[in-house]
């Protein structure tokens, strides 16, 4: 009989060590975080610790615990319910499915909501098929519009229905990650039909 899978078995020690180091540097900030982690399942708590261990200090200071909890809970659920996600190398899962940040965008809860919206459309699909379907969904929900403001969160692009290339790619990467498809944002320098770098998304 096969042994049951252990969530983040290979990286557990590294995550705990880096989280404790962050907490040591910011004890007053992490005290309430530790209290809230005690109310989470072991897997969700570990996912949250990964986010806090490797996020920039600005994210720690600017956003409440509940924002990151959404990313952690969705990531754990994907790992438990989708064998394709559970089979991913841990480094790919951590960096390109679970992690909350894509670029320098505003961070807001979105993963659980996006999964609920997209999930039925990709039922039974492999990653490649799911990626195409997610791309179609994103095209239905948001179109290109040039802006100069700070990069919006993925959920704000969805609600507004448009965004510049960087915002559209942040939206799409979050949508892909919300259903377990590993993805990241990439830039194409000297893109022929625009003035500067052109943002897109890349499946890992």
What is the predicted function of each stretch?
Residues 1-133, 140, 147, 178:
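N-terminal accessory/pre-domain segments preceding catalytic cores
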